[in-house]
Design a protein with these regions (language model features):
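Asp-based phosphoryl-transfer active-site loop
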Residues: 9-25, 100, 240
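Active-site metal-binding loops of divalent metal-dependent hydrolases
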Residues: 19, 52, 75, 231-233
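Short, acidic loop-to-helix structural element flanking the phosphoryl-transfer center
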Residues: 26-43, 89-96, 149-154, 206-218, ...
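Active-site phosphate-binding/coordination module
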Residues: 30-136
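Short active-site oxyanion
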Residues: 43-47, 66-68, 166, 225-226, ...
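Short, structured coil segments at secondary-structure junctions
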Residues: 64-66, 73-74, 82, 187-188, ...
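Conserved acidic, metal-coordinating active-site core of Asp-based
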Residues: 103, 107-110, 114-230
Length: 282
């Protein structure tokens, strides 16, 4: 990272979605969209870097003609959206995923497995979200996801030998969250991150958005020093450290702000656009 105000040679901008760029689940503001267009016109690649799996990235981004590459599943998979193919992966071994699921089987949880660009969950989970899982009304948009359903997640893993890009748990009851977290921390081979106070995200040990950014830069022949990252939360720390310039929105966590080269306006005030305008286009 750097702190100088000198002109930067930014060739790629990797940006988090939730809490950094999007307003709500799938709304891209006009200012943020224009900032992306201006960056593209300046020859800068604009790359979503998200904890979401490939098919959960909203059309407001995937339908933009200049969005070609995406870091997904917190670095578990990097996609060429135009060609609809995976460029590189860092997957959780099936055996490790089964160890994780063995813990989950002791609780009533909303669990998602991200496998080859799609979300997999237990049949009926979205229907129970409002009651059993207690989803708050403002989060109901999470229930509109296009899932692959299974009756038993352990059986699914055994039968398909799936190697997940990421495992995601949403809206974990506070009464059991510390216990679940403690049990997961005893397992080897996994990386735990948090994008909200009530979720847990699991990747392969050593996998994060930063390692994926390095991989994508290598594929494209770009020096990571010429990359800019924009984020807000714990799952963004890896790429904020990996990029040559790190911008954190005003609503970001203190740990992210502490490693930022610049702290910009909050997400809701289009801090992403501010970062692009001030530090990539000058």
């Amino acid at each position: 990272m750097e702190n100088t105000e000198a002109k930067r040679n930014i060739k790629l901008i990797a940006f988090d979605l939730d809490g950094t760029t999007l307003h709500g689940f799938a709304e891209l503001s006009e200012r943020n969209r224009r900032a992306m267009e201006k960056a593209n016109d300046a020859g800068i690649l604009v790359v979503p870097a998200t904890g979401r799996v490939r098919n959960f990235i909203p059309p407001c981004l995937t339908e933009l003609p200049f969005i070609r590459y995406a870091i997904t599943s917190n670095g578990g998979a990097v996609w060429d959206i135009l060609e609809n193919k995976v460029l590189c992966t860092d997957l959780i071994p099936t055996e490790t995923a089964l160890e994780v699921q063995k813990i989950f089987d002791d609780y009533e949880l909303y669990v998602e497995y991200y496998v080859h660009g799609r979300g997999v969950t237990k049949r009926g989970n979205p229907d129970k979200a409002r009651t059993v899982f207690g989803f708050p009304e403002e989060k109901y948009y999470f229930l509109t996801k296009d899932y692959t359903f299974t009756d038993n997640l352990s059986a699914y893993l055994k039968e398909t030998h799936a190697e997940p890009e990421k495992i995601n748990m949403m809206f974990i009851p506070e009464s059991v969250r510390p216990e679940i977290l403690a049990r997961l921390q005893k397992l080897g081979g996994i990386e735990l991150t948090f994008s909200n106070v009530d979720n847990i995200e699991i990747n392969k040990k050593g996998c994060d958005k930063g390692t994926a950014l390095y991989s994508l830069c290598k594929v494209l022949g770009i020096d990571p020093k010429n990359a800019m990252a924009a984020g807000d939360n714990g799952s963004d720390l890896g790429m904020l450290k990996a990029a040559g310039f790190a911008a954190v929105v005003g609503n970001g966590i203190e740990e992210a702000k502490a490693i930022a080269d610049a702290v910009v306006a909050p997400c809701i005030e289009d801090g992403f656009a501010e970062a692009v305008e001030r530090f990539a286009l000058r």
